[in-house]
Amino acid sequence: MSKSLYEYDFPKDLKKMTFDELDLLSYQIRDFLIEKVSKTGGHLAPNLGVVELTLALHFTFDSPKDKLIWDVGHQSYVHKILTGRAKGFDSLRQFGGMSGFPKVCESPHDVFDTGHSSTAISLSMGMAVSRDLKHDDYNIVAIIGDGAMTGGLAFEGLNNISESGRRVIVILNDNGMSISPNVGGLAKHLRNLRTSNQYLNIKKTAKKVVDVPYIGDSLYKGMRNAKDHMKYALLPKGILFEELGLTYLGPVDGHNVEELVNAMQAAKKINGPVLIHAITKKGKGYRSAENNPDKFHGIGSFNPCTGLPNPSKGVSYSSIAGDEILSMAKDHDDVVAVSAAMCDATGLRKFADKYPERFFDVGIAEAHGVTFSAGMAASGLRPVVAIYSSFLQRAYDQIIEDVCIQKLPVIFAIDRAGVVGADGETHHGNFDIAYLSTMPNMTVFTPNGEKQLREAFRIAYGLKSPCAIRYPRGECPLDNNAVAEPNCISENTVIDLTKYATERSFSGQDVDIWAVGRMQEKAKEIRIILEEKGMSVGIVNVKMVKPIDLSEFDDKAKIIVTLEDGTLNGGFGEQFSSKLYTQRIDRDRFENNQTSLISKDEYNNKVITIGWPDKFIEHGDVKNLEKKYSLDAESIAANIEKRYNELNLDR
């Protein structure tokens, strides 16, 4: 009877195994992944596709002395199993449990905290410089793929490595996918390489030659020189990576451990940058994931027997946003949609199917996607760019330089805004309010629920200027009238944003809560708690954080609370407070030298700003994270009541 994965002493035991034993282990690992991820959710399909690749890595290299750098990091589950962390999978991505990404604090085998795409090659170059300057001797391996090679940063790194000539091994995990299928010229080039039998046969021969005693290395170098002269005849389009200065090994079967080990051993003998091109299948070994790799890229809990996800509670913000963008496209021929390799995840699949000529997937290239959209906007189109909040950070410069400065009508549909949970620090979207609100010409919508979300898109189309619409992950509160309302916004509509930005839903003399976006729902919970304690509580729904509208400001309220699902530093609360100090209005009760809405002393006493603290928030269920950081309704209500009592206010 074979051992369970918990009984192995990994990675030590791995190096004692035969190739046949490693093949058997690959089946065991896949069964383990399916069982565990079906309960916790996670990145299943990418990890099923790298089982043999990861086995070969830990069989060939000596981690942690040799540095294994996982690009993005979502494909590191097998790596975690093979470095002694199998028991951690019961708490994978759970509050207080094991991260779904490499974490330096978790294991010495995790050499860098990754989470975003296309960084591993640049990281490997930096580590190679450090190694060489210190005269150390170890291998540095960057594992990149699952679409990450479509990112420009990856090619900046390749360019730098090829120029330096430093000893770095890049392993390209080519599964033809990112989240959606790979797009662009690079994807076509890789497909050509996969089908080049002539080149593959030469490489197989070369790998055999390396193993010839005493003379193998010399013969291999000679074959490399001969290959340089032959490749143009064999492959008219050339080998892109060879032209960039890397020795190219492959394509190799990414599900054959022996082939992979042979390629890696050959790469270790080359004194310079090497790229191993491994062909893998995303979702390998689990039919549901093989047939629907995009659905199983990142998935919640599911039934492992049927492959069907566990029932969701409702309709997501992403789905409603996608429907509204499609509705805009039906009404306006100039509307186009742009995705960064996340068509399904951002709700754009219906749009792509209905209007394929108006849908553009730019790959994992957010910066390019924004400037590409700016070009379309400058030429008369109305692009809607649907990107996760965390990933939009990668295009910060392009938003300012190419969109806002020229006041171009690009609509940013910012999905997964706020703290999103299980994927942790690298995937939370809690900085967008702070950085987008500082950009001149930018309008920022923060809708809560279906009605406000649909309205935001309709108003944004009519503004003819840069607009950002941020909305959270998960279930969207529905409104039966939201779809039925006519689309009254046209290119000639004039919108008075100051009359739309805020909306009072409740009035109260004791506490006034200004709630941004999804926090409007939490404000209702807080109101119930405080009113049971005898307080009168008002709520202002903040549907836009730029411009900030103070028309609903009630200076008679004893306590004013701002509530946002974003970082406090530079967030709505700080900007709201600043405007209270500086806004100049005419009111009879103010003298000429007292023109602010609120004095500094009053502010210190009565204004409470609530949001996420100045730190990177870890992974875990959102409710648990809110509880830890006192952002749950009960903790916020207690905080307000404490301030109220400290001021000796009457109820």
What positions do the PLM features span?
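Cofactor-binding active-site loop characterized by glycine-rich and histidine/acidic residues
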Residues: 43-164, 334-335, 340, 348-349
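N-terminal amphipathic, basic-rich helices that act as targeting or association modules
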Residues: 2-81, 240-246, 251-257, 277-280
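Short beta->alpha connector loops at strand-helix junctions that form conserved
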Residues: 362-363, 387-388, 446-449, 563-565
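Glycine-rich, histidine-containing beta strand-loop boundary motifs that form or position
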Residues: 48, 70-72, 144-145, 172-174, ...
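Extended, hydrophobic alpha-helical segments in both membrane/secreted and soluble proteins
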Residues: 140, 144-149, 153-157, 347, ...
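Short alpha-helical segments and helix-capping/turn motifs at coil-helix boundaries
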Residues: 38, 50-59, 123-128, 152-159, ...
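Thiamine diphosphate
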Residues: 91-123, 133-137, 163-295, 308-353, ...
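Helix-enriched interaction subdomains in cytosolic or periplasmic regions
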Residues: 301-303, 437-482
